[in-house]
C-alpha cells in the first residue's frame, strides 16, 4: 500500500505519523490551499458573533482565523458547536467548551441530531465557515426557528500543481488516496489528466462522508470507502488498519 495524503499544508501531520508507526509508505501533496478573506476584519460580522446565542464552527480553519480577531474565550453567553472532532479540540485548545457532532457522524447532518439544536425559536446563530460552503445547516436551523448569519473567514483554492505530479504518483505506486472534503476531491479530478483516469479508478479512495462518496462515484471512481469522519482515526480505520 502507498498512500497519498492531500489535505492543506500543515494538516497532514497526524496521518503521516500514524502511517509511519504502521510502516506504511506515503506521499504528501496538498490539494487544497486556505486563504483568509477580508471578512476576518468585518466589524459587522464580528458584532454578530459577539451578540450570538450560538456560534457554530465548521472547521479548524474557521476557529484559527476567527480567534485572531475575536476573543472567543471571553464570550460570556454563546454556546459553541464544532462539526468535527478536530474542530472541537481546536476550540478546546483555546479554553473554549463546545458541543460536537456524534463521534460516528461527524458531519453537518450529525450536528443537527443534537438535542440542543432542535428547538431554536428566537435564537441568533452565527456559522463560521469558508466561502461557498453547503447551505443544509443554515436552512435546517432556520426551519427550527433560528436567525442565521455567516462569517466566512477563509476561502479554499486549488494550489498550483506541477503537471508532472500525477504521473509521479502513478510511478511511485500510489494505490490509496485520502480525501477529506469535496473540494479536495474536485481538485484531484481537475489535475489528473484523462490518460491517467484508468489508474485513478484502480486507487482506493477514502472519503469523509456519504455525500463525498456519492460525488466520487459520480466521477467514475470505483473503489470508494466512507470513513464517516475526516479525522485521522476514522481514516486509518477505513483503511482496515489499527493505530
State each model region's role.
Residues 1-243:
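Signature of uroporphyrinogen-III synthase
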Amino acid at each position: 500500500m502507498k498512500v497519498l495524503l492531500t489535505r492543506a499544508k500543515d494538516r497532514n501531520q497526524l496521518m503521516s505519523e500514524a502511517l509511519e508507526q504502521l510502516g506504511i509508505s506515503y506521499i504528501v501533496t496538498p490539494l487544497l490551499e486556505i486563504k483568509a478573506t477580508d471578512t476576518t476584519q468585518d466589524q459587522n460580522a464580528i458584532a454578530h458573533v459577539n451578540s450570538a446565542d450560538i456560534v457554530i464552527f465548521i472547521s479548524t480553519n474557521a476557529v484559527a482565523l476567527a480567534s485572531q480577531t475575536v476573543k472567543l474565550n471571553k464570550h460570556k453567553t454563546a454556546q459553541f458547536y464544532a462539526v468535527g472532532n478536530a474542530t472541537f479540540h481546536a476550540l478546546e485548545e483555546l479554553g473554549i467548551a463546545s458541543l460536537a457532532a456524534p463521534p460516528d457522524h461527524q458531519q453537518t447532518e450529525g450536528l443537527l441530531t443534537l438535542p440542543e439544536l432542535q428547538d431554536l425559536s428566537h435564537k441568533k446563530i452565527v456559522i463560521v465557515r469558508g466561502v461557498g460552503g453547503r447551505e443544509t445547516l443554515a436552512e435546517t436551523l432556520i426551519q427550527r426557528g433560528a436567525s442565521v448569519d455567516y462569517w466566512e473567514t477563509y476561502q479554499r483554492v486549488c494550489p498550483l500543481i506541477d503537471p508532472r505530479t500525477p504521473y509521479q504518483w502513478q510511478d511511485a505506486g500510489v494505490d490509496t488516496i485520502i480525501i477529506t472534503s469535496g473540494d479536495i476531491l474536485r481538485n484531484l479530478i481537475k489535475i489528473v489528466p484523462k490518460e491517467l483516469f484508468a489508474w485513478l479508478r484502480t486507487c482506493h479512495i477514502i472519503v469523509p462522508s456519504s455525500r463525498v462518496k456519492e460525488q466520487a462515484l459520480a466521477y467514475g471512481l470505483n473503489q470508494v470507502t466512507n470513513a464517516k469522519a475526516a479525522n485521522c482515526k476514522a481514516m486509518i480505520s477505513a483503511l482496515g488498519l489499527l493505530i
